[in-house]
C-alpha cells in the first residue's frame, strides 16, 4: 500500500510532476500520513544523506542546513530536522566547525 501511494504521488520519479498528498482522494479510511511515515531505516538513511551534504558543502552553521532543507528538501529533511534529528545534526555541524578552527 505504501508503494502504491508513493507511486500515485510520483514521489520517487524526479521527472514527473509531484502531487500533494492532501489532494489525494482516499477510500476506506486509509491514512496516507501513516503510510508515508518514515521508518527507522528511512530516518537513518536521510541523516546519512544530510551528513554527506554537510561535508560536501562545508556547512558550519545549522541555519544554513535548515534554510536549504526548508527550500529544497521540505518533504524529507525538513520534518526530520524539526521533529527528532536536529540534535545529532547540530552536534555534527558544531564538531566540524570546531575541527576547522584548529
Curated annotation (Swiss-Prot):
Source superkingdom: Bacteria
Keyword Secreted listed: no
GO molecular function: DNA binding; DNA topoisomerase activity
GO cellular component terms listed in the entry, alphabetical order: extrachromosomal circular DNA
Pfam families on file: Rep_OBD, RepB_C
Listed InterPro entries: Plasmid_rep_OBD, RepB_C
BP GO annotations: DNA replication
Disulphide linkage map: none
Keywords: Plasmid
Protein family: Belongs to the Gram-positive plasmids replication protein type 2 family.
Record-given protein name: Uncharacterized 12.4 kDa protein
Organism annotation: Staphylococcus aureus
Amino acid at each position: 500500500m505504501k508503494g502504491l501511494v508513493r507511486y500515485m504521488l510520483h514521489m520517487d520519479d524526479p521527472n514527473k510532476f509531484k502531487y500533494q498528498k492532501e489532494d489525494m482522494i482516499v477510500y476506506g479510511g486509509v491514512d496516507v500520513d501513516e503510510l508515508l511515515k518514515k521508518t527507522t531505516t528511512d530516518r537513518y538513511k536521510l541523516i546519512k544523506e544530510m551528513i554527506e551534504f554537510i561535508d560536501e558543502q562545508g556547512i558550519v552553521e545549522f541555519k544554513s542546513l535548515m534554510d536549504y532543507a526548508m527550500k529544497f528538501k521540505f518533504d524529507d529533511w525538513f520534518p526530520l530536522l524539526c521533529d527528532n534529528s536536529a540534535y545529532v545534526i547540530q552536534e555534527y555541524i558544531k564538531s566540524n566547525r570546531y575541527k576547522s578552527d584548529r
